[in-house]
Amino acid sequence: MGALGYVMQVPEEEKYLNTQKELEAMLVGYLGGRAAEEIVFDTVTTGAANDIEQATKVARAMITQYGMSQKFGLMGLASQENQYLSGRAVLNCGDDTATEIDHEVMQLLHYSYEEAKRLLNEHREALDKIAGYLISRETITGKEFMKIFRAVEKGLELSLIHISEPTRH
């Protein structure tokens, strides 16, 4: 099944390392589409499947590889197998610890999902305006998104501001 829409996250600068806060923000971003579905339509669809998969990979790496777990601290719980082929992470722990890791990953994803819902509810008017713009134009750039967001947050009429970027030929 194909995607009806997607978000492409383009880094502002080339980076090789991410902070814990940046990874936590990525999780919230990945889960934002599912959270918006629940808020706006009071239901969820299969549309967020890839986002959930990506969020789970990031959360699991935070816990097992990056030492970003309160419970496990700096303990390396996974290593890369065939780094240059599949790059798959393999757990270096017993079944009980693997179960605890799953629990930590679920908690991190749950917190991130709740944070996404909180932010979307807090900025619901901007969400609706941006969705309306996206429906009429089919695509939106980061700059256009931020213009609409800032205008709504400042209480400005959208009809009074120029939103779309000039077309390049």
Predicted regions and their residues:
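Short "domain-exit" segments at the C-terminal end of structured domains
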Residues: 165-169
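Soluble catalytic regions of large protease machineries
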Residues: 1-160, 164
